[in-house]
Amino acid sequence: MKFLFDLFPIILFFAAFKVWGIFTATAVAIVATLAQVAWVAFRHRKVDTMLWVSLGVIVVFGGATLVLHDEKFIQWKPTVLYWLFAIGLLAARYAFGNNLIEKMMGKQLTLPHPVWDKLNVAWALFFAVLGVANLYVVHNYTESQWVNFKLFGTTGAMVVFIILQSLWLTKYLKDE
């Protein structure tokens, strides 16, 4: 259910794009992300840093798209977001000694610290590659194809990455 909740703004963006085009879809994505943050704040009293970053990036890049009437800004938004996540994961670990992946998943999984470090780097690389893939699609395909990639391509890549990661992690999990 959380996975669908996380996809809420993207799904609404996709639907609005198909009906009204990129600029209305951008406005819908901004409002949907604001609503998502408001709901999380109301329901849980605490909003994850990643969601705040997502909100900031959609407001800045979506706002630039609407104000300047240039769709390139919203198309660059996923790349900027993915690269911020990648940099954040690596900076937290290597500059501040905090493994954010371990902090997020440590209660669910018991893993040796070197495995957590590999997982952290894997996620950072995954986000970096997603950012590059997004730029490739933006510059080599139509706007409609990019929107399809944004929903189906990146979501599919995420699912495949999580499955592969889960298979890799099974050798480190202890029978409980």
From Swiss-Prot:
Organism: Burkholderia ambifaria (strain MC40-6)
One Pfam family in the UniProt entry: IspA
Chain's role: Plays a role in cell envelope biogenesis, maintenance of cell envelope integrity and membrane homeostasis.
Keyword S-adenosyl-L-methionine: no
Location relative to the cell: Cell inner membrane
Assigned keywords, A-Z: Cell inner membrane, Cell membrane, Membrane, Transmembrane, Transmembrane helix
Keyword Transmembrane assigned: yes
InterPro entries in alphabetical order: YciB
Family from the record: Belongs to the YciB family.
Protein name: Inner membrane-spanning protein YciB
GO cellular component term, pick one: plasma membrane
Topology with respect to the bilayer: Multi-pass membrane protein
Record-annotated membrane-spanning stretches: 3-23, 24-44, 49-69, 81-101, 119-139, 149-169
